[in-house]
Swiss-Prot record:
One of its GO terms (biological process) is mitochondrial translation. Its main location: plastid. The lineage of its organism: Eukaryota, Viridiplantae, Streptophyta, Zygnematophyceae, Zygnematophycidae. Residues 24-33 have a biased composition (Basic and acidic residues). This is Large ribosomal subunit protein uL2c. InterPro entries: NA-bd_OB-fold, Rib_uL2_dom2, Ribosomal_uL2, Ribosomal_uL2_bac/org-type, Ribosomal_uL2_C, Ribosomal_uL2_CS, Ribosomal_uL2_dom3, Ribosomal_uL2_RNA-bd_dom. Gene3D superfamilies: 2.30.30.30, Nucleic acid-binding proteins, Ribosomal protein L2, domain 3. Residues 24-56, 227-251 are annotated as: Disordered. The keyword Transit peptide does not apply. Pfam families: Ribosomal_L2 (PF00181), Ribosomal_L2_C (PF03947). Part of the 50S ribosomal subunit. It comes from Spirogyra maxima. Belongs to the universal ribosomal protein uL2 family. Disulfide bonds: none annotated. It is found in: Plastid, Chloroplast.
Length: 277
């Protein structure tokens, strides 16, 4: 799972680097576990842009990932390690003893042919899923549920890992990749180990077209716009923003302004905010 760098054959390859894909052994997904994805270009049901700088991109099929890991007590065998265009982590096609096949996130160190298991009695090895109450302190975990039975919601990106640092009562204390320390019910399931493809953050797109393949459109800086279009715009030549604080195109404070609601139910479960928050 290394990174391949290009020589400067063209301006686009001068600073370009991509994943080697050496761990992938299958190019086409399991057809029964895929579905169509409709593109919305960042627009809502009325056609209004609600998320800017989105559109285009390569056509994708969605892979149905088993984040719940609710097939308990049934051994599974890793058949393939595959590329998933919808995430930067790799996925594994798993065949269970009863004949069912499911996709799961690829855990670092899991190889083709390995056995995995989900349930309270599963051994503590990468790829197995257990309730937090059955996982020892100090263990690295990922794909963590926030509510029992809802499926993993956090720590799912490539190379991410959380650590169990304490348990008290019905809650476990986790240190998340962002530096946040959070309480999670011990009945929640988590997968042992670290998410694979740890070099995902070391890739360099190298050219604008690579960003367009991902469905990301150009971002125009507000300081180069007209004053009618953005609060930072206007002025003669290269002018500063002319405000005490940076503002969004709609005049709201940004770049450091906290946007998280204090009325969220989980506010009391966060013991320490994430870094730079």
């Amino acid at each position: 799972m290394g990174i391949r760098s290009y020589r400067a054959y063209t301006p686009g390859t001068r600073n370009r680097s991509v994943s080697e894909f050496t761990e992938i052994n299958k190019s086409r997904p399991e057809k029964r576990l895929t579905s169509k994805v409709s593109k919305h270009q960042g627009r809502n049901n009325r056609g209004v842009i609600t998320s800017r700088h989105r559109g285009g991109g390569h056509k994708r099929l969605y892979r149905d990932i088993d984040f719940r890991r609710d097939k308990q007590g049934v051994n599974g065998t890793i058949l393939t390690i595959e590329y998933d265009p919808n995430r930067n982590a790799r996925i594994c096609l798993t065949s269970y003893e009863d004949g069912e096949k499911r996709y799961i996130l690829h855990s670092r160190g899991v190889m083709i042919g390995n056995q995995i298991l989900s349930g309270p009695d599963a051994p503590i090895v990468p790829g197995n899923a257990l309730p937090l109450t059955n996982i020892p302190l100090g263990t690295s975990v990922h794909n963590i549920e926030l509510q029992p039975g809802k499926g993993g919601q956090i720590v799912r990106a490539a190379g991410t890992v959380a650590q169990i640092i304490a348990k008290a009562g019905q809650l476990a204390t986790l240190r998340l990749p962002s530096g946040e320390i959070r309480l999670v019910p011990q009945a929640c399931f988590a997968t042992v180990g670290q998410v694979g493809n740890i070099d995902a953050n070391n890739r360099k797109l190298g050219k604008a077209g690579a960003k367009r393949w991902l469905g990301k459109r150009p971002k125009v800086r507000g300081v180069v716009m007209n004053a009618a279009d953005q609060p930072h715009g206007g002025g003669e030549g290269r002018a500063p923003i002319g405000r005490k604080r940076p503002l969004t195109p709609w005049g709201r404070l940004t770049l450091g302004k906290r946007t998280r609601s204090r009325q969220k139910y989980s506010e009391n479960l966060i013991l320490r905010r994430r870094k730079n928050a």
